[in-house]
Amino acid sequence: MKQIDLKILDGRIGNEFPLPAYATEGSAGLDLRALTESALTVAPGQTVLIPTGISIYIADPNLAAVILPRSGLGHKNGIVLGNLVGLIDSDYQGPLMVSLWNRSDKPFTVEVGDRIAQLVFVPVVQARFNIVNDFAQTERGEGGFGHSGKQ
């Protein structure tokens, strides 16, 4: 298991609320919690930025982290990430914040400590461009959206 530096920014972590942890041996994501001062109601159509109480420093340029929605929040309550996916670069050291967007038609209350998103570490390949006039021919070629069919 890869070791990542984590800084606790809110003293409630480790006391009232646990550090982010994998729920099972097969879990890909670690749950991030809402570390607000009090409950927060998100109105329909509103987007809010919520602190998680932690910062991380990945340090390895071959890794990044992504903040992803929790499936139940989106499916059951219409709560998704305001930026759809949050990308955490390996050299970022600031606080992890979660942008929540209420796309439903009902207010949604986020309680202090609620699990609101998940953090997943992913491999990164930094590429260098090779300028060419033409590409090698493929069966697909320039076929774009819908090119491969529906079934």
From Swiss-Prot:
What Enzyme Commission number does this protein have? 3.6.1.23
List UniProt keywords, sorted A-Z. Hydrolase, Magnesium, Metal-binding, Nucleotide metabolism
An example molecular function term from Gene Ontology annotations:
magnesium ion binding
Q: Is Magnesium tagged as a keyword?
A: yes
The pathway that the record names for this protein is: Pyrimidine metabolism; dUMP biosynthesis; dUMP from dCTP (dUTP route): step 2/2
Cofactor(s) the protein needs: Mg(2+)
| Catalysed reactions, as listed in the record | dUTP + H2O = dUMP + diphosphate + H(+)
Pfam families from the UniProt entry? dUTPase (PF00692)
Q: Which domain of life is it from?
A: Bacteria
GO-annotated biological processes: dUMP biosynthetic process; dUTP catabolic process
* Gene3D superfamilies, alphabetized: 2.70.40.10
Binding site residues for substrate: 70-72, 83, 87-89, 97
Q: Which InterPro entries match?
A: dUTPase (IPR008181), dUTPase-like (IPR029054), dUTPase-like_sf (IPR036157), dUTPase_trimeric (IPR033704)
Note the CDD domains from the entry: trimeric_dUTPase
Q: Does the keyword 4Fe-4S apply?
A: no
Q: Which residues form a coiled coil?
A: none
According to its UniProt entry, the function of this protein is described as: This enzyme is involved in nucleotide metabolism: it produces dUMP, the immediate precursor of thymidine nucleotides and it decreases the intracellular concentration of dUTP so that uracil cannot be incorporated into DNA.
- Give the family from UniProt: Belongs to the dUTPase family.
Protein name, UniProt field = Deoxyuridine 5'-triphosphate nucleotidohydrolase
Gene name in the database record: dut
